[in-house]
Amino acid sequence: AEGVRYAVVPCKDSQGYIYYQSSVAAAQTNISATTFDAAAVGALKEAGITPVASICAFRDPQAPYVDRTMAVRYQDTEYFWLDAAADAGGKPWLNPYSQGAANYITALIDEARAMGFEQIWLTGVQFPTIAGRDKANFGDTGGLSMGQRLAQLLEGWQAGGDCWVE
C-alpha cells in the first residue's frame, strides 16, 4: 500500500445496493450479498490509508419501493416518475425534497461515520436531469428552489464531517 493515501469504499451505489449490514429500515431489502464491516475500515486505517465512504444519494431505483413517500412522483399521481419508459428499463429516483429520503441518506452517512469512515464521497446529489423531468412531481418544495434544497441538504451532511460531492 506504499503511496496509497485513500481508499474509496462503496457503501451505497447508484443501483441502490448497500454494501454493509445497515440497520436503517429502508436499506434492509437492498443489502448486497457482498458486504464489509467496521473491521475492514479499521484495517485500512491501520495500514495508514484514509477510508472514504462512497454513497450515491438520490439516484436509487430500489428504496422508493420500500418507502413510496421517498420517491419522485409522476405528475399528480401516486405512480413513480421513471427516468425512461418502463419498457425501456426506466427506474424511479429518490426525491430530494422528501424528508424521508433526506433522512435515509443522512442515516447511511451517520452509519458510515460510526464504522470509522473519516470522509464521505457523495454522488447522485442531484435532481433527475434527463428528458421527461417536466412530468416529475417533487411535492412540497417548502418554497426552496432545487439548488437551495441541495445546498440545504449538503450543509447538514457536511456539518458532521468531511463530505465531498461529485
Predicted segment positions?
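Aromatic- and glycine-enriched glycan-recognition loops and surfaces
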Residues: A1, A27-T50, M146-Q152
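N-terminal structural segment of carbohydrate-active enzymes
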Residues: A1-V9, I49, Q99-A102
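Catalytic domains of carbohydrate-active enzymes, especially glycoside hydrolases
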Residues: E2-Y17, E111-T123
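Glycine-rich, proline-tolerant flexible connector loops at the mouths of alpha/beta enzymes
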Residues: C11-I31, G124-L144
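Substrate-binding cleft and catalytic face of glycoside hydrolase catalytic domains
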Residues: S14, A43-D67
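The substrate-binding groove and active-site-proximal loops of carbohydrate-active enzymes
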Residues: S22-T34, A88-N103, D140-S145
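Aromatic-lined carbohydrate-recognition surfaces of secreted/lumenal glycan-active proteins
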Residues: T50-D60, I120-V125, G142-E166
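Active-site-adjacent "subsite" loops/lids of carbohydrate-active enzymes
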Residues: F58-D110
